[in-house]
């Protein structure tokens, strides 16, 4: 579940050690729910275009596409596409345990060991106006394990979701030709600036802010362009869990609906994209069998294009959880991005991301009750062919504690006694299909 505090994040390495015995591959999360997973464009921006509606495009801010010379006719036939994502990461502290490689990141967590992060295939048929369509996303690897893990429920035999290899499975009905429609099933969450598939992001690793929003949801979503404002799309979600664990998001045992909404505005001139989401719920936020917890999560992000080769992005996440019995947690997280396309094949991307994670009662993870993690990340990418992307990335992480009860990052003796972590990674993503 993507409700990571750093105690949970550090538990991830331990959990994956066990999970690695069950699967031989490595994983991912926010694949764009579009009819294809295109490779990164020559110009700046992630691999997906701005969403007209959640049923047809990724619900995350992206670089607006350049005007096309001629639009291709709609394709309503069966289609498929996918990707393979692998990496090698070295932690300069050189921990002995390969699963203790990068305690603050989500997917690139293996140290000094080549790893398959994600193998994914999408099968879909776009919905013609007044007709039905569908999409299924199948995946394996560490990404599938992490997206569907419930570490707090592991002692109850609930360490993984049974259908972890089915990341998305939903039907679509197109209400009109202008992009209105309804989806029913399991789909990626609208929250977050970054997505599961690394080639859809500016950097290979995910930001600190990414740690505080969900991975996926299950239920219904209804979306439509706002009358009189065709650049603005509104979406309403009725789900069985704003956050997801083995039970939440697929069979939420709180027996209550969660409510989410999204507003997505794309500047008609292509200068910026602005997206805001809000989620309200009362669910078993702290794992299977935990207390009922009031949940509020809000995500706001902006992408601004300076020109055809340069862009900046901003992301702000607010999350508050109030479990029955006390122990309120309030999170304010942020990320700042800059991407520069150098030429047709090369680009650089910089990111600074952090959070203030405050506990009032309950578990105290820092001397003053507030965890303040941050990361500084620099990425150089090489797009050698249309369907292969290589990245070299340096990342520095910091947390404001490293005491025995609440450990920090792992050192060379595999003891989590450090406040800082430095890693470098080499990754490759191969895409295929239509």
Spans of features found by a protein language model:
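N-terminal periplasmic/intermembrane-space "pro-region" immediately following the signal or transit peptide
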Residues: 2-99, 104, 427, 434
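Outer membrane beta-barrel
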Residues: 67, 72-243, 253-257, 264-273, ...
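Outer-membrane beta-barrel proteins
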Residues: 70, 106-111, 156-159, 172, ...
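Outer-membrane beta-barrel translocator domains and adjoining extracellular loop/strand segments
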Residues: 92-100, 146-153, 162, 194-201, ...
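Hydrophobic, lipid-facing positions within transmembrane beta-strands of outer-membrane proteins
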Residues: 114-121, 164-171, 216-220, 257-261, ...
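Residue-level recognition of beta-strand termini and adjacent short loop/turns
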Residues: 176, 227-229, 307, 343, ...
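Detector for outer-membrane/organellar transmembrane beta-barrel domains
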Residues: 231, 254-256, 261-374, 432
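Outer-membrane beta-barrel "beta-signal"
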Residues: 382-384, 388-392, 416-434
């Amino acid at each position: 579940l993507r409700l990571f505090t750093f105690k949970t994040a550090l538990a991830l390495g331990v959990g994956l050690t066990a999970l690695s015995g069950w699967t031989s591959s490595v994983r991912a999360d926010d694949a764009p729910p579009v009819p294809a997973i295109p490779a990164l464009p020559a110009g700046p921006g992630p691999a997906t275009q701005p969403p007209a509606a959640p049923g047809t495009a990724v619900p995350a801010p992206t670089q607006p596409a350049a005007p096309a010379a001629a639009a291709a006719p709609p394709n309503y036939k069966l289609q498929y596409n996918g990707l393979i994502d692998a990496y090698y990461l070295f932690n300069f502290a050189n921990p002995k345990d390969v699963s203790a490689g990068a305690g603050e990141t989500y997917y690139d967590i293996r140290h000094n060991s080549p790893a398959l992060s994600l193998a994914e295939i999408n099968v879909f048929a776009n919905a013609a106006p007044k007709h039905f369509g569908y999409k299924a996303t199948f995946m394996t690897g560490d990404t599938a394990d992490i997206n569907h893990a419930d570490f707090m429920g592991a002692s109850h035999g609930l360490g993984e979701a049974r259908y972890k290899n089915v990341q998305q499975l939903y039907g679509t009905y197109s209400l009109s030709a202008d992009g209105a429609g309804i989806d029913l099933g399991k789909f990626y969450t609208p929250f977050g600036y970054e997505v599961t598939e690394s080639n859809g992001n500016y950097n290979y690793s995910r930001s600190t802010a990414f740690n505080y929003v969900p991975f996926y949801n299950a239920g219904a979503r209804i979306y439509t362009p706002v009358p009189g404002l065709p650049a603005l799309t509104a979406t309403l979600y009725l789900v069985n869990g704003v956050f997801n664990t083995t039970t939440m998001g697929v069979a939420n045992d709180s027996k209550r609906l969660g409510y989410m909404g999204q507003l997505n505005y794309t500047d008609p001139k292509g200068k910026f994209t602005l997206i805001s989401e809000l989620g309200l719920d009362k669910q078993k936020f702290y794992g299977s069998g935990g207390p009922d917890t009031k949940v509020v999560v809000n995500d706001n992000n902006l992408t601004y294009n300076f020109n055809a080769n340069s862009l900046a992005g901003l992301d702000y996440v607010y999350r508050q959880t109030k479990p029955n019995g006390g122990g309120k947690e309030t999170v304010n997280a942020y990320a700042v991005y800059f991407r520069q396309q150098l030429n047709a094949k090369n680009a650089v991307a910089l990111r600074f991301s952090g959070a203030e994670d405050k506990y009032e009662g309950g578990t105290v993870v820092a001397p003053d009750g507030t965890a303040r993690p941050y990361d500084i990340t620099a990425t150089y990418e090489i797009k050698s062919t249309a369907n292969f992307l290589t990245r070299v990335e340096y990342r520095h992480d910091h947390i404001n504690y490293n005491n025995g009860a609440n450990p920090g990052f792992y050192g060379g003796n595999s003891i989590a006694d450090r406040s800082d972590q430095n890693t470098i990674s080499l990754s490759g993503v191969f895409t295929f299909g239509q």
